Amino acid sequence: MVSVSLSHHNLWPPESGSTAFRGFATAASVHACHHVSRHLRLDFHLRSSLKKLQHFSDDARMKFARYQRVFVFNGANFLKSRVDIRLSQSSPFVCFFNGGESRLNPRGGEEGSSNPETSKRNTVNGRRWTNVLLAINVIMYIAQIASDGKVLTWGAKINSLIERGQLWRLATASVLHANPMHLMINCYSLNSIGPTAESLGGPKRFLAVYLTSAVAKPILRVLGSAMSYWFNKAPSVGASGAIFGLVGSVAVFVIRHKQMVRGGNEDLMQIAQIIALNMAMGLMSRRIDNWGHIGGLLGGTAMTWLLGPQWKYEYTTRDGRRVFMDSAPIPLLLRWRNEQRRL
């Protein structure tokens, strides 16, 4: 995950003198992202392009049983499942989980046949917007190539121009990249963490976190303290701020559901190591925009804390279904508003 600061006089690849460091940064970033994809494993039967993600424990003593893999928010299935689920008629933020129709064998699998087409479709749906964002990054880079790499024209982050009213640069900078290696690192990182974040929060919350993090990245520099101007006056491009926001989003989810997740502390340690590694690389080179990384991380963390999900067990119905409530601040506020309307 690298966000590159560009010289005003050199808006294409960095000078050759930094080749050795760029090689180290590339290897370190790829290694860090590989650790993310290995350690953030979800038991939602969703796959990234690297491997099947399995994170939730198969331990029957967990508050979530093995078959409870679907979360519903306002009528939308955020995580796919093969079991029965019903949305509460009294509140759009209540989930009913029922595993009675899907028996589990001792090895952790389900008895009976499964539909390969359904499994494939669920896997694709679980990363649909990740694929869209990857395609946008590649298409925008092709457009840059066609225009001789003029990233300023396409919307690179330039503090002075943003302050003059070109606010669109807050968003467009996150889909631009300085060179092919920059694009490859960020696409690899997005492909590693994106499906996990999209599966945990669903497409709407995933996009909200990604876009907020992308915008929060330059805002921290433009509206922040004088130190941000001092350390990063140059234009910058890159999707790493938004990707850092997704990392923060996954961290918030793990923290909120630590009692339901086996190995949550280890996952948080891995996330902390990845963040620290990228921060260290930023300190070693002025061409890596640490302020963008910090801004994206804070933006994604804050948005996930507000939007959720934060699933809280409420009770078990007479027919054995467990009811979970999304108790994140905004879902709570919306539920309260809906209740007030019914009064």
Swiss-Prot record:
<dbReference type="Pfam" id="PF01694">
    <property type="entry name" value="Rhomboid"/>
</dbReference>
<keyword id="KW-0472">Membrane</keyword>
<protein>
    <recommendedName>
        <fullName>RHOMBOID-like protein 10, chloroplastic</fullName>
        <ecNumber>3.4.21.-</ecNumber>
    </recommendedName>
</protein>
<dbReference type="GO" id="GO:0006508">
    <property type="term" value="P:proteolysis"/>
</dbReference>
<dbReference type="InterPro" id="IPR022764">
    <property type="entry name" value="Peptidase_S54_rhomboid_dom"/>
</dbReference>
<keyword id="KW-0809">Transit peptide</keyword>
<dbReference type="GO" id="GO:0006654">
    <property type="term" value="P:phosphatidic acid biosynthetic process"/>
</dbReference>
<comment type="function">
    <text>Rhomboid-type serine protease that catalyzes intramembrane proteolysis. Required for correct root growth, floral development, fertility and photoprotection. May be involved in TIC22 processing during its import and in AOS accumulation in the chloroplast membrane.</text>
</comment>
<dbReference type="GO" id="GO:0031969">
    <property type="term" value="C:chloroplast membrane"/>
</dbReference>
<dbReference type="InterPro" id="IPR050925">
    <property type="entry name" value="Rhomboid_protease_S54"/>
</dbReference>
<feature type="transmembrane region" description="Helical">
    <location>
        <begin position="235"/>
        <end position="255"/>
    </location>
</feature>
<feature type="transmembrane region" description="Helical">
    <location>
        <begin position="291"/>
        <end position="311"/>
    </location>
</feature>
<feature type="transmembrane region" description="Helical">
    <location>
        <begin position="132"/>
        <end position="152"/>
    </location>
</feature>
<keyword id="KW-0812">Transmembrane</keyword>
<dbReference type="InterPro" id="IPR035952">
    <property type="entry name" value="Rhomboid-like_sf"/>
</dbReference>
<dbReference type="GO" id="GO:0004252">
    <property type="term" value="F:serine-type endopeptidase activity"/>
</dbReference>
<feature type="transmembrane region" description="Helical">
    <location>
        <begin position="206"/>
        <end position="226"/>
    </location>
</feature>
<keyword id="KW-1133">Transmembrane helix</keyword>
<keyword id="KW-0934">Plastid</keyword>
<keyword id="KW-0645">Protease</keyword>
<feature type="transit peptide" description="Chloroplast">
    <location>
        <begin position="1"/>
        <end position="26"/>
    </location>
</feature>
<keyword id="KW-0378">Hydrolase</keyword>
<feature type="active site" description="Charge relay system">
    <location>
        <position position="293"/>
    </location>
</feature>
<feature type="transmembrane region" description="Helical">
    <location>
        <begin position="167"/>
        <end position="185"/>
    </location>
</feature>
<dbReference type="GO" id="GO:0019374">
    <property type="term" value="P:galactolipid metabolic process"/>
</dbReference>
<feature type="active site" description="Nucleophile">
    <location>
        <position position="240"/>
    </location>
</feature>
<dbReference type="GO" id="GO:0009706">
    <property type="term" value="C:chloroplast inner membrane"/>
</dbReference>
<comment type="similarity">
    <text>Belongs to the peptidase S54 family.</text>
</comment>
<keyword id="KW-0150">Chloroplast</keyword>
<feature type="transmembrane region" description="Helical">
    <location>
        <begin position="267"/>
        <end position="285"/>
    </location>
</feature>
